[in-house]
Amino acid sequence: MGDLLSDEARRAALVELPGWREADGGKAFTRTFTFRNFNEAFGFMTRAALVAEKNDHHPDWRNVYKTVEVNLSTHDAGGITARDVALAKKMNEIAARFGI
């Protein structure tokens, strides 16, 4: 599960997570990724899904054509933990491969 991050730790994490912001009153991180087309968006989701499954930590996300909206929160902990920060970083790395 993991321990909830403090307000200070959440703010510090966001500095290292370009494109992400707090949502749900500080209980989640969110980002919308916009790709060139559906194939890239789906490719991103496929790669991110493999990482999520490997780490047994899954995003709440939604895909419409070339956009992917992601919300990260550790539901068992009731907010943001280091697991969410790690997955957000990995998602940014994957998106960078697509020029995002």
UniProtKB/Swiss-Prot annotation:
SUPFAM superfamilies reported for this sequence: PCD-like (SSF55248)
Keyword DNA repair set for record: no
Pfam families assigned to the protein according to its UniProt record, in alphabetical order: Pterin_4a
Catalyzed chemical reaction(s): (4aS,6R)-4a-hydroxy-L-erythro-5,6,7,8-tetrahydrobiopterin = (6R)-L-erythro-6,7-dihydrobiopterin + H2O
A GO term for molecular function: 4-alpha-hydroxytetrahydrobiopterin dehydratase activity
GO annotation terms (biological process): tetrahydrobiopterin biosynthetic process
EC code: 4.2.1.96
CDD domains: PCD_DCoH_subfamily_b
Keywords: Lyase
InterPro entries linked: PCD_sf, Pterin_deHydtase
Record family assignment: Belongs to the pterin-4-alpha-carbinolamine dehydratase family.
The protein's name in its UniProt record: Putative pterin-4-alpha-carbinolamine dehydratase
Protein's organism: Afipia carboxidovorans (strain ATCC 49405 / DSM 1227 / KCTC 32145 / OM5) (Oligotropha carboxidovorans)
